Amino acid sequence: MNNKNLTPTVWPSGIGIGWRPDIAGVVAALPGLGFCEVIAESVPAVETAESWLPDLLAVDVPIIPHGVGLSLGGAEPVSAERISVLTRCAQILDAPLVSEHIAFVRAGGVEVGHLLPVPRSHEALAVLSDNIRRTQDFLPVPLAVENIASLFEWPDDEYSDGEF
């Protein structure tokens, strides 16, 4: 599905927060909250959000599925199955967009269990761009990408963090 002509009815703006059920009361009382993120991989396979997010829906802010497992920066193409998780979440939550990290989380079929920084090279940038484009082509809403805190630098980086 290509969504380049879609115009969301509500763009999230302002300050957002990552949703956790144990902070539902705090979130509900936050003044001026612009949006909430929900970890996409934790969204159950249900048809509506009412059955599992009633407290968040009561806050009445846009809910953004936030992925942590696409591995956009990985050398392997992004899995269609993982993209379908984001698609399903966007549909269930009536989300104006979805987001994911600029990171890699697997290589050679091995999940590392952590968001790892992408080497800042020409080659890695080309792979990242292809993976973002491929992912966006199958999503029903725009994809926002978020950088991660790099805890280390790759020895052969060709760009600074800001340039990349």
Predicted features along the sequence, with ranges:
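Active-site acidic/histidine proton-transfer and metal-coordination neighborhood
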Residues: S79-F164
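Short, basic, glycine/proline-bearing loop/turn elements
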Residues: T9-W11, G34-A40, G67-G73, P117, ...
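Structured, acidic catalytic/metal-binding patches in enzyme active sites
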Residues: V59-D60, G67-V78, I102
